[in-house]
Each structure stands twice: as C-alpha cells, then as structure tokens.
Amino acid sequence: MTNKGKKKVNPFDRKQFYDIQAPSTFTNTYVGKTLVNKSAGTFSSTDALKGRVFEVNLGDLTLEDNAYRKVKLRADEVQGNKILTNFHGMDFTSDKLRSLVRKWQSLVEANVTVKTADDYVLRVFAIAFTKRQANQVKKTTYAQSSKLREVRKKMVEILTREVSNSTLSQLTSKLIPEVISREIEKSTQTIFPLQNVHIRKVKLLKQPKFDLGSLLALHGEASEEKGKKVAGGFKDVVLESV
C-alpha cells in the first residue's frame, strides 16, 4: 500500500494584489501593493481591505528628503484593484527624535486636541528647543519656567488656530513643508528664540461619516455620487489607538 502525499497548494493562488493610492496632496500617489485573500463565499476581499492602515515614509510620497517622518494612510474605498486611502496620522522616527535632544538647551512640548474644518478630531503634538540669543556668550540656552510657559501657550494658540481653520487635506499640505512649525518659530522670537521646531506627531481620534464623493475629490477623481451618503455609511468612530 502506497502513501499518497498531499498535493501542495501555493498559498498565493488564493490571494490577490491591490494597488495602494495616496491622496493627490502628495507628489507621488503610488504607495505600493498589498495582499488579501480572494473573495469566496461570504468573505469579501474589499471589506477586508477597508480600514487597513499603511505606514509610508513621507520621503517616498514627496520625492524629497523627508525620511524622518512617517505617514499613516487608511484604506477607505476599493475600486477595481485600486485602494483609495486617506490621511490617518503622522509621526517622527525614533532616531530623529533622539538626534534633536542635546545638552545645554530647554525642551518645550505642547499638544492640542482640535477639530478640523471638515470635522476630523486630531491630537497634534509639537516639539521645540531653545537656542542661543544674538551676542550670547554663555554656552547654555536654558529658559526660565515663566518663559517656557509663555512659549507653550503661544504654540498651543497657533496649533489650535491652524488646525481648526483647515480641512484635513489643507492641514496635510501645511504639515509636509512644515508651515506651522515655521510660524511657531517666528511668533515666539520675542519671547525666547527657538530652533528645531517640529510637528512631531498627529493622531486621528475621530472621523466624520464616510463620504465617497469627498474621497474621490481628494484623489482628483469625479463621481456622480459626490455629496451623497453611502448606504450603510460609517458612524462617527472613536479610534482606540493609532
């Protein structure tokens, strides 16, 4: 009696590749590919893809030297073999953060929880360091606690204003060239000069109901369904972790 071996099955035969597309806010919208099991029975591959979060180096999206920042993109819609994503957060690499911390300077951190003009609730974290003043002889640049409080108050004020007056897409456009960071650095000069001012992290806490038309517009596409609610659309969801 001979033992018949089991037929080897290639696991990739049951899987399908999808292209990941970033919003048109970025220079390079092609992120890469992702795998998912093919639809079978009650299992839907498109449903399995929705909600996936992809972490991408910002330098790959802007084709510039932004390798120290990571962007999170969330899969919101699948059309054909293409995944349409939306901004889901941003963070610094740990080695970049460590390189900023040095001796003889004060660290200033601030964070705010703000709703954008299109109802996304974000928590934005900013970081800055004191620098030597003009004609300063002393090596250290430590600031008094009262000065640090003033600087932090100004940082919170600018973060709140910039986020609340922008849509998520507009805010992303400000984050890429660090427009907000430069505004903080400029506005705090009269209080205490700063250096290495950065928006180091952005967390998405809550998102509005899903709108296909808005997503297509974000990707530079048109749709007859623009402005209509999708059947069985998402409710406001508080994300536990990012």
Curated annotation (Swiss-Prot):
Disulfide bonds listed in the record: none
Compartment list: Cytoplasm
A GO term from the CC aspect: cytosolic small ribosomal subunit
Keywords: Cytoplasm, Ribonucleoprotein, Ribosomal protein
Superkingdom of this protein's organism: Eukaryota
Gene Ontology terms, MF aspect: structural constituent of ribosome
Keyword Ribosomal protein found: yes
Gene Ontology terms describing biological process: translation
InterPro entries to which the protein is assigned, alphabetical: Ribosomal_eS1, Ribosomal_eS1_euk
PANTHER family: 40S RIBOSOMAL PROTEIN S3A (PTHR11830)
Subunit and interaction comment: Component of the small ribosomal subunit. Mature ribosomes consist of a small (40S) and a large (60S) subunit. The 40S subunit contains about 33 different proteins and 1 molecule of RNA (18S). The 60S subunit contains about 49 different proteins and 3 molecules of RNA (25S, 5.8S and 5S).
Family: Belongs to the eukaryotic ribosomal protein eS1 family.
Entry protein name: Small ribosomal subunit protein eS1
Species of provenance: Lodderomyces elongisporus (strain ATCC 11503 / CBS 2605 / JCM 1781 / NBRC 1676 / NRRL YB-4239) (Yeast)
Record lineage: Eukaryota, Fungi, Dikarya, Ascomycota, Saccharomycotina
